[in-house]
């Protein structure tokens, strides 16, 4: 059965992890917020991760093993409780998605 899990990504390799996990058929989600920065004296808006270095993934461990996900380029490890990767409640993920959509409009 598919569940959401939380991954820790290697430093500055979140994009690489998303690309490689997508190739394996794993749904990835990392919420982003729009922030204003001053670059070379100009104010610009850019997207930054809400949780830097962390990403949510949705997959079925019977189809794709934890080891396969963990050994994907860009992924450091699962967030675990003991030896078992910790699942994340779907309501939390959908709430984050809803808030992110509301910020864009």
Please tell me what each predicted stretch does.
Residues 1-105:
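Acidic-enriched and Gly/Ser
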């Amino acid at each position: 059965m598919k569940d959401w899990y939380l991954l820790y990504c290697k430093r500055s390799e979140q994009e690489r992890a998303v690309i490689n996990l997508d190739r394996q058929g794993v749904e990835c989600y990392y919420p982003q917020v729009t922030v204003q920065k001053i670059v070379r004296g100009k104010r610009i808006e850019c997207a930054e991760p809400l949780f830097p270095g962390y990403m949510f993934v949705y997959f079925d461990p019977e189809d794709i093993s934890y080891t396969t996900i963990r050994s994907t380029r860009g992924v450091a490890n699962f967030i675990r409780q003991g030896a078992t990767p910790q699942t994340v409640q779907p309501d939390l993920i959908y709430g984050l998605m809803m808030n992110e959509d509301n910020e864009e409009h």
